[in-house]
Amino acid sequence: MTYTLNDWFGAKVTAAKTGVLLNNEMDDFTAKIGVPNLYGLVQGEANAIAPGKRPLSSMSPTIVTKDGKTVMVVGTPGGSRIITAVLHTMINVIDYGMNVQEAVDAPRFHQQWLPEATNVENFAISPDTRKILEGMGHKLGNPQPANHLAAILVGAPSLGGKPVGKNRYYGANDPRRNTGQALGY
């Protein structure tokens, strides 16, 4: 299950008698064509507010399976950066053989087409690489506020790791925000 507030404290309104924060998911519709939303996404007529429509959303709670068995669960808040952060983590575990915490900790970059800039985390690339990319015409933006990714790997701390015991879960929590904690058993 996943839920979005969209922005810190959502719409900044709570449901009467419950204290449950209401989201501001309406920001994911195009309120005014060509004007960026909270996350800098510039949207058009196709995402205009209209009856019966669903807002554009990047929510991506992800379960990775192999041979019908769950091997990894990963998710994060972060608006337009969600898909990028989830994909980076999956690639780091599956293709680069990182353990789940290394995969979550690894530097990330994000490109969303509009605005035309690639946001790169500090220390993700060397100053020389930055200079080369900018010399090729790439626009490198400053890092955006961090996602707070969490991931669980089932069976071993990495896909290449040797399973220890039965039904072990290895959790990883993103150090970019000082919130939450992941534990495994």
Model feature map: region roles:
Residues I94, P127-Y185:
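In a subset of proteins, long, contiguous C-terminal domains/tails are tracked
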